[in-house]
């Protein structure tokens, strides 16, 4: 029974990893796009429009929730959702942990509620380099609700927690964003800031 449970756990973990890994190539694609680098070096309005349209098309083809590019201060210079009323364009996301990691050259990973849209998502961030120097950050926002829906259809009792013990995915949506263990006051404060 224990061995079967471990296999099930491993299967769920691989399913989550597989879902997220479908999007990990996208920051590299942005790094290769000349207009993205040009925009980060000189944020001219006409260039911004070209990059917005490029990101919109890439987002549509990849089926991610949103793709956006930030300068090194955390300001969104271009976004795939530029046409939407709740567009990220111009937003200051410097407070986000995924941005802070990526601008330092680390992979940024974060599950949270969007500060602009109020919509949950998994964020993958990557520093965009030019001649060995980070000139901006690419962010891919991914929806993972399809995974939860598959668990529900299969009548599985499953959930995934982040490093703080917060449930970020669950076959029972009412469990989402609840903690599996008590949070310290410091952790609560850090999470509120993020």
Placement of each model-derived feature along the sequence:
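Juxtamembrane extracytoplasmic/periplasmic/luminal helical "stalk" adjacent to the first N-terminal
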Residues: 1-42, 54, 62-65, 107
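N-terminal short leaders/motifs
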Residues: 9-19, 65-83, 182-192
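Extracytoplasmic/periplasmic ligand-binding sensor regions of membrane-associated signaling proteins
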Residues: 60-63, 73-150
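Solvent-exposed, extracytoplasmic
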Residues: 50-61, 92-97, 137-192
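Amphipathic coiled-coil signal-relay and dimerization helices
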Residues: 38-39, 74-82, 167-171
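Conserved beta-strand and immediately adjacent loop positions that scaffold enzyme active sites
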Residues: 66, 122-125, 157, 164
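Short, structured helix-loop boundary elements
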Residues: 2, 6, 24, 45-48, ...
């Amino acid at each position: 029974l224990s061995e079967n449970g471990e296999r099930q756990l491993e299967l769920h973990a691989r399913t989550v990893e597989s879902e997220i890994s479908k999007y990990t190539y996208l920051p590299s694609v942005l790094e290769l796009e000349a207009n993205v680098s040009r925009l980060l070096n000189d944020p001219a309005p006409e260039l911004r429009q070209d990059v917005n349209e490029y990101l919109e098309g890439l987002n549509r083809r990849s089926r991610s929730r949103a793709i956006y590019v930030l300068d090194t201060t955390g300001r969104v210079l271009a976004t795939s959702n530029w046409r939407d009323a709740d567009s990220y364009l111009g937003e200051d996301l410097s407070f986000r942990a995924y941005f802070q990691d990526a601008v330092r050259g680390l992979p940024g990973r974060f599950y949270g509620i969007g500060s602009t849209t109020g919509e949950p998502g998994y964020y993958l961030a990557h520093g965009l380099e030019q001649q060995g120097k980070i000139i901006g950050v690419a962010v891919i926002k991914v929806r993972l609700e399809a995974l939860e829906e598959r668990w529900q259809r299969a009548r599985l009792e499953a959930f995934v927690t982040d490093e703080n013990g917060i449930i970020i995915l669950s076959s029972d949506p009412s469990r989402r964003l609840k903690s599996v263990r008590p949070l310290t006051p410091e952790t609560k404060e850090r999470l509120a800031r993020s």
